[in-house]
Amino acid sequence: MIAKEILAGLELFEGLPDDAQSAISAFSKELSFAAKTTIFSPEQSSKQIFLLMQGSIRLTIFASSLSEPVTVGVLKTPGQAFGFSSVVGQGYYNSSAEALTDVRVISVEGRSLMDYLDKEPAVGYTVMKRLAHVISRRLGVMRRLLLETIIDYERQASSIDEN
């Protein structure tokens, strides 16, 4: 169980009523991971949402045409959410998360959080709106990476002499 005062300082939960923070803290816990530890990967079922407390996390995705994973984000700011597939309807993680340094995170049980948010729609709206903002930022990064890849490909293709 995490102290509600800690949750109150995190982006997803700041400003929520005390009773909401108390309820969420009941199904939250602190975890630590050593540097180079894989926290989750795409083949794992998603049961938790994570919030960074200390350290750095690298988020990667795998593309079948590449030998190395593609980094889609590095999280360093306390409170940043990751691994939120369990609260957006997916049953699995769609990326990998690796600890770049020793890290401390808060793990929130996804099913318990969703059950609580369903019972408290005003709190649910606030949390999901904040989560949508996080997802929007991540999609912006992915869009930029995709455009850079397309531009690089087109530059290479246009420089090929067919004669």
Predicted segments with their positions:
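Cytosolic regulatory regions built on CNB/CRP/Popeye-like sensor folds
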Residues: 1-163
